[in-house]
Amino acid sequence: MKTTQYVARQPDDNGFIHYPETEHQVWNTLITRQLKVIEGRACQEYLDGIEQLGLPHERIPQLDEINRVLQATTGWRVARVPALIPFQTFFELLASQQFPVATFIRTPEELDYLQEPDIFHEIFGHCPLLTNPWFAEFTHTYGKLGLKASKEERVFLARLYWMTIEFGLVETDQGKRIYGGGILSSPKETVYSLSDEPLHQAFNPLEAMRTPYRIDILQPLYFVLPDLKRLFQLAQEDIMALVHEAMRLGLHAPLFPPKQAA
C-alpha cells in the first residue's frame, strides 16, 4: 500500500473531530468554489443529494451529520478511516453499506489536486449520490463482489469503479452531465470532462473494465451512462462474468503516455 503525508484526525471521547481553523478555511474555499463550477454540469440526482445533505460552508462537517441524512434516505453510513486503506477494507466497508471517509483535508498548497482522497473529495464528491437508491445499490453490490473477488479480478473491478463512481458521465435531456465524484470534486476536471477535448463513449461495462487509466492526469476518455438507473440495472447483471470476459480479452492500448519515473 502507498504511503501518504496526511494523517486522519481522531475524534474526542464524544466522537467529535476537532479541526483547526485553517482547515475549515480550506473546506470553505473548496466548497464555495466548487458549488459554482458544478452549476449546469452536475446531474440532477447529485444536486438533489447536495440539497438533502445541506453541507455547511464555513466548517468541515462532522460524520454524524452526514450519517443522519444517508441513513434516512438509503440506509448508508460514512465510516472514518485513515488516509489510505487496503482494498480488502474498502470492499468490506462498501459491502456493509459504509462509505470510507478519511478525516483529513488537503493543505492549501494542494488545493487543486491531491492523489489521496480527502474528506472534501469523499463527502462533496461521493456522499450526495449515496442518497440515490440506484447509485447506492450499485455501490453496495460492487462492495459485495469485490469482497469475494481474487486479487486479479479486483484490478478489473477497480477499472469499473474508476469509470463510473469516480469519473462517470450521464446523458440527460439537457446534455451530458457529471455524476462521478472524482470529477465533481475537481474544478479543472469538471469543466474539462464536458468539453470537446476528451473522448466520450457510450457506457459499456466490459469496455470500461478493459480501459487503462492513470490517477494523476485529466482523463482522456469518459464513459457516458444513458441514465443513472443503468447502474442499478448493472447491479442485477452478472458483473463477475464480465470481469472474466475482460480478463480473457485483455486491456486496450492506453490513451495516455507512460508515467515518468520520479
Swiss-Prot record:
PROSITE patterns: BH4_AAA_HYDROXYL_1, BH4_AAA_HYDROXYL_2. Keywords: Iron, Metal-binding, Monooxygenase, Oxidoreductase, Phenylalanine catabolism. Pathway: Amino-acid degradation; L-phenylalanine degradation; acetoacetate and fumarate from L-phenylalanine: step 1/6. Binds 1 Fe(2+) ion. It comes from the Bacteria. Its cofactor is Fe(2+). GO terms for molecular function: iron ion binding; phenylalanine 4-monooxygenase activity. Fe cation binds at residues 121, 126, 166. One of its GO terms (biological process) is L-phenylalanine catabolic process. It catalyses: (6R)-L-erythro-5,6,7,8-tetrahydrobiopterin + L-phenylalanine + O2 = (4aS,6R)-4a-hydroxy-L-erythro-5,6,7,8-tetrahydrobiopterin + L-tyrosine. The keyword Oxidoreductase applies. Its EC number is 1.14.16.1. NCBIfam families: Phe4hydrox_mono, PRK11913.1-2. Monomer. Belongs to the biopterin-dependent aromatic amino acid hydroxylase family. This is Phenylalanine-4-hydroxylase.
